[in-house]
Amino acid sequence: MDESRARALRNDLTTFASRWWAGEAEVTRTFFSQKRSKDEHLRWLRMQAFKELQPRPNGIIIRLISELRDDYNRLEHGVDRHDFLHKIQFLEEEFRHYQLFADVVDYLTGEKITPEELAQYEVPEEVRLRELRSSLMKEHGDLARFASSFCEGGGASLYYEGMQVGGDALHDMIATACRGVYEDEIEHAEQGASGLEQGHWTEEQWALA
């Protein structure tokens, strides 16, 4: 497949996904267009903090820490230093996202949120999404990994809309948190899109993506 065809298919995929990203943006705008109670904010903020930390045995933070520990013992002996650094940077990003939203939770409650408290905010839809991504990656490998990265964070719609709020201390903190995540998610999406565009995929694989 030539470069121009791959770029056209990437654009088609973006157009296809955009309808759902627009829907997420509309939901977020609607939420912030009305005055919300402390409990309403705490619910979504705790769910978001959970999503970033994933406080469970196979959660992304603890998994990356474990992988880095194992990889360090093989550094330059099967583990490339650039790949090792990339994993460190990814760990920093994910934990920083948690820190940003957890700080807003602490501001509202006046107490420190703990991983144990956050564990109760895992919703069934998140579990199903995680299981779906895992099964697709096992079946389709890099194709599913790039497609998942491309769509990561719902096109960053929530974070983009959240960046626009402000006017008081709470909403300023929310905007700061969303801005910090937005910039990273856009980069992840670009990496996924580039991986798809530069891969040697067939028309059928693009349709599957």
Predicted regions located by residue number:
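Non-heme di-metal
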Residues: 1-209
